[in-house]
């Protein structure tokens, strides 16, 4: 049964209904610009401790809405909690970002077990806590990274502009790379469904490094098709839950992404010609 918040201006707008005003929310609306966030972050000891503490992450999720009249809360978490759930060591280094134990060979992919969804239970607890405290006219957004983006981090071992290790891996071991994509696809689908069951009223899928696949002419195979499979699985169970797709830096292939996935709402990057994209999408929402 869908848990749709019909009073939310955000949900009404994302579903193409008339609303009183344009809803506002920010992808990173909780964070270091808030002194109250910095205080909690300091007490938590580490970024990951904060992400995996339901009470603290719920408080951080709600902080921006106490300061600003935003229309939605987006859960405070990180896309790399998924590699953590399959025992890939992860740490965040100051001024460098995430570092995790990289996948070095094909064998590691076939031995990889993505079954520890209970490891992510603190995220679902956080969603439930936020939902219980959120005003009814505010929506709650859950999210996850898309398979290609997560795979890129798991092979590279850290963030990168061009992800050379990942590119080399899928160029030389495409069958094994697709095995990793498929495993992640299944896990991410289940993770997002669990978020909906915990209270999320909309879901965002972050394909943050779509540009890497695009450069290698693999955007459809590595990004669009896995995203589409995740969307279809969620929609079979929760057809009314809106899903937002963000294939960052997809350039002229944003339209193809929307056409194939039938996504409810599209997030775009700063390089997009909005007027041109709207003309290409016709009646689709942005």
Question: Language-model segments: what does each one mean?
Answer:
Residues 119-286:
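Active-site loop segments of alpha/beta catalytic cores
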Residues 1-91, 228-229:
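N-terminal basic, low-complexity leaders that serve as flexible interaction/assembly modules and, when applicable
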Residues 13-29, 70-96, 118-162:
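Glycine-rich, aromatic-flanked loop segments that form ligand/cofactor-binding clefts
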Residues 74-94, 99-104, 110-116, 199-220:
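Glycine-rich, proline-tolerant flexible connector loops at the mouths of alpha/beta enzymes
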Residues 46, 53, 102-106, 162:
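Intrinsic-disorder/low-complexity, polar/charged segments
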Residues 48-49, 110-121, 178:
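The substrate-binding groove and active-site-proximal loops of carbohydrate-active enzymes
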Residues 24-33, 96-99, 160-161, 218-219, ...:
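Short low-complexity stretches enriched in small and charged residues
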């Amino acid at each position: 049964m869908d848990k749709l918040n019909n009073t939310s201006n955000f949900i009404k707008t994302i579903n193409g209904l008339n609303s009183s005003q344009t809803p506002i929310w920010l992808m990173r609306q909780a964070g270091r610009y808030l002194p109250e966030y910095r205080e909690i972050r300091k007490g938590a000891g580490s970024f990951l401790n904060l992400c995996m503490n339901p009470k603290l992450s719920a408080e951080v999720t709600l902080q921006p809405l106490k300061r600003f009249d935003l229309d939605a809360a987006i859960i405070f978490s990180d896309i790399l909690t998924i590699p953590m759930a399959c025992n890939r060591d992860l740490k965040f280094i100051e001024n460098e970002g995430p570092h995790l134990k990289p996948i070095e060979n094909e064998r590691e992919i076939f031995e990889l077990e993505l079954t520890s969804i209970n490891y992510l239970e603190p995220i679902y607890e956080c969603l439930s806590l936020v939902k219980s405290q959120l005003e009814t006219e505010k929506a709650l957004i859950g999210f996850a990274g898309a398979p290609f983006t997560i795979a890129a981090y798991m092979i590279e071992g850290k963030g990168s502009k061009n992800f050379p290790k990942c590119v080399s891996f899928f160029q030389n071991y495409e069958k094994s790379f697709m095995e990793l994509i498929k495993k992640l696809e299944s896990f991410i689908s289940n993770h997002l469904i669990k978020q909906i069951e915990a209270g999320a009223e909309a879901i965002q899928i972050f394909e943050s490094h779509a540009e890497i696949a695009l450069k290698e002419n693999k955007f459809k195979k590595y990004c669009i098709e896995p995203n589409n499979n995740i969307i279809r699985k969620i929609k079979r169970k929760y057809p009314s839950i809106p899903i937002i797709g963000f294939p960052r830096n997809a350039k002229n292939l944003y339209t193809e992404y929307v056409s194939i996935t039938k996504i409810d709402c599209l997030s775009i990057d700063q390089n997009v010609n909005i007027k041109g994209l709207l003309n290409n999408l016709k009646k689709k929402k942005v």
